[in-house]
Every structure is written in structure tokens, then in C-alpha cells.
């Protein structure tokens, strides 16, 4: 048995417990499909990823965005040389390594899973002056390179995540969901919290994905954010008010600011903050008034004690 985050188990329970071992071995097997030529194996994988809209602009109506990164054979040949080894890319199997995805790409990828292999190009504009968006590209079904039958075990695994896996604390009594937790490790500081979900499980109406920087485990923060949004959309109200209050009362700015300071120091552009003179004056005035108030209270107490 291989120890560590779930072991090398079959697909469904590996999705359920987010097994790094299983997915690393699966990715390694793909790279080793062509002995001595891992570039060919990673190119086959990259081609499939591109068909989900990853590693490229989605051709949507957003003015800004990022292609992210799906590394191919040329990428690794440039980085490690033509004789690079599969183990140098194995971390891609667990979603780490050189893979870069945007939140909208994660949501779109999840929508393709819900549809068993196709997706509409995501867009913001639904209608103009009450008329449907005339852009035909948003009405075309984009087919992925994965046969619909291969999505069934993935969907069962995402169902198990919520029923008895890493996302079980987010299960709702009012709607079913399919989900995947994610914890993107950061070299320094807390990890990024990632979660993506489909609801309802048997008749999908909404996909929600969230990435919360330096927040920790996926099910701890990004998961509650996603499930609260889905709940409001599907039910028209919030049944789990405690999740909403916990989210709106939280702040990750301290860790985010710390990471920013680390970055500035790394590139030699950090300058210690200079105390604002007006702010310091206000603090000093407040302390003076507080001291005067305390002295007044002390004097009154002394007078009271002297009274026969």
C-alpha cells in the first residue's frame, strides 16, 4: 500500500479523498506511454486539455483575461532539454507543477463535465435591449475530445466528495451537488483555497467555482463560498445563514499583505511604512485624553476612600 493522502486507489474514491498518489501515477503512466519520448505523451494530454478551453483565451466577451498555462512537450524541452524525464512533470497529475488556470476556466471545465463533454463559450452579456445576444459564437456547442462515457466515473467521484469525502461538511439537505476540492500550495505562506461544484447533481442548473488566495484548504473557505452562491441561486434564499456570516466576517488581507511584502523584498522594492504624522497626532491625543480620564477616576477613588 502506498501511504499519503489516500493511496493508489481506483478513480472514484481517489476523487472523493483527493488522492495525490493516484493522479500522479495516472499522469506518469500517460507520459510513459511512449518510452523515451515523454513529449509525445504530454502533447496528447495537452491537446485534450485545450479542447476544454484550457491554456487559451476562451473567446468570450470579457475585456481582460489570461490564457493560463497547459505545458506541452516544447515547454519541457525548453526547460529541461530534449532528454527530459517524466518524473520532472509528474506534479501536473495532482494539479500542481506548471499548470495555471483562471477561475473562469475552472468553472468552464466543470460545466463540460456536467454536460458530459461539451460546453458553451462563457459570456457576460445575455441580452441587449431585451433581445438575446446576437453573437452566434455563444450558441455553438464546443465538443471536447473525451467520450461522454468517460465522464460517468468522474461524476460519481465528485458526488462522493460531498457525500463522504473532502467536501462532506458542505452537504445540503435542500439540493444535491457534485464537487471537487482543491488546495493549491504556495511556496511561502498559506495555500490557496479552491472549490468547484455542479448543482443539482441529477439535473445541473449552475456551476460555481472559487479561488481564494492564501485561505487554506478548499473545503474550508472556497467551498462554503460556492455552496452559498448555489443555494441562493437554486432556492432564492439562504438556508445556511451561519456559512454566510462566517464568510462575510472573514478577512485574508493580513496574509495577502504579508505575501506582497515578501514579493517586494524579493525584487528589492520594499520600503518600510512611514508613520503618518496626522495619524500619530491623533493616537497621541487619544492616549493623553485616556490618561487624563484615568487620573480623574483615580482621584475620585482616593477621595471616596478618605471619606469617613
Give the location of each predicted region.
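Beta-lactam-recognizing serine transpeptidase/beta-lactamase-like catalytic domain environment
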Residues: 1-215, 264-267, 284-291, 297-308
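Short amphipathic alpha-helical face segments that pack within enzyme cores
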Residues: 102-108, 221-228
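Short, gly/Ser/Thr-rich active-site loops of penicillin-recognizing serine hydrolases
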Residues: 133-142, 223-288, 297
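Extracytoplasmic/secreted cell-surface and envelope-processing proteins
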Residues: 23-25, 217-221, 239, 243
